């Protein structure tokens, strides 16, 4: 299970990160805070290990140092804003997050801690970096995500444009380099950024390694990951890439793409084609729900529900019993009818009970977070949910694209409004 955390994030310091510091030098001032040389050195070593594990050739040390320092500065700025606005992550929330990470790696939290320490990580430091990530995630949600909405008209336009382009399920694996232009930049600053971007593009045209060039020059959020944006469907592409990317062949590099943020270069790493119709198995079901309270214990409720089930098996009408006894008032009015249910609509325990039944069968009483149930499956059918699936997917893809664009603008504004003084040696 070694190196279980390579893909989690690069800000997890190895042991020794928080050791006592003698005459530690300040390498950056970030508003009222500072970044210390020891922090920078530890982060650089961690990023070097990650890039080496990915097989990415390393840029010169001073270049990597400046890229890493910029990431530390941006982290400081976001944590400062979170602190000023009262965002906190308590130990209970933190422990739940750690438990999920351990579970995702197939481990208990205790086993996970042992693996971390065997791989050279200090667990208390790891905990605090997870806390920082959760704080920044909450900040992004409040400042960006919650302010993004998607209208019905946007979904309709998205689907119309997808049909015009064809192959709406095509996916693109992209890498990206951004050379930023400051907010309210002068013509000279714009020209300087463009000249730098053209030099970078020329290096790529001459065969330079894209990942190394991205780590060296890119101002994008994924610079230290070699500019890798991962797999994107058309609707997940930034708006300014939509007309460019479909024209590229795998391995192609785009021309310069101008945006308010600066100059972009995109490489198409790989491509995959269309998907298929979305056919799902729907279940028509009805149920009776009983809840325990101060007048009836869990055992008494379970016994009462067993008696109702036996009455149904003996010939009593399910609908009449549901109307008379069920605590789910919404479905009770319809004789317990839940209609046609698609996968994912019900909680897992309820779906598990439905899956185990053939049409006409009635379950034994079972418990969920809502109380005690008996469920009867009436029928099953295959339903083409492609249109509904496409609309839901369109909404998610539009939202993701808008969030990414807003986040980039928000981070740029946060950086431009901050006081940052670099004290690295030239």
Swiss-Prot record:
GO biological process terms held by the UniProt record:
Gram-negative-bacterium-type cell outer membrane assembly; protein folding; protein stabilization
Keyword annotations for this protein?
Chaperone, Isomerase, Periplasm, Repeat, Rotamase, Signal
Cleaved signal peptide residues: 1-19
Q: Which Gene Ontology cellular component terms are annotated?
A: outer membrane-bounded periplasmic space
Question: Is Methyltransferase set as a keyword in this record?
Answer: no
Looking up PROSITE patterns in the UniProt record yields:
PPIC_PPIASE_1 (PS01096), PPIC_PPIASE_2 (PS50198)
The molecule here is called Chaperone SurA
Pfam families registered for this protein in UniProt:
Rotamase, Rotamase_3, SurA_N
Cellular localization per UniProt: Periplasm
EC numbers for this chain: 5.2.1.8
The chemistry this enzyme catalyses reads: [protein]-peptidylproline (omega=180) = [protein]-peptidylproline (omega=0)
Q: What is known of its domains?
A: The PPIase activity resides only in the second parvulin domain. The N-terminal region and the C-terminal tail are necessary and sufficient for the chaperone activity of SurA. The PPIase activity is dispensable for SurA to function as a chaperone. The N-terminal region and the C-terminal tail are also required for porin recognition.
Q: Which organism is it from?
A: Nitrosococcus oceani (strain ATCC 19707 / BCRC 17464 / JCM 30415 / NCIMB 11848 / C-107)
Record function comment: Chaperone involved in the correct folding and assembly of outer membrane proteins. Recognizes specific patterns of aromatic residues and the orientation of their side chains, which are found more frequently in integral outer membrane proteins. May act in both early periplasmic and late outer membrane-associated steps of protein maturation.
The EC category is: isomerase
Q: Which GO terms describe its molecular function?
A: peptide binding; peptidyl-prolyl cis-trans isomerase activity; unfolded protein binding
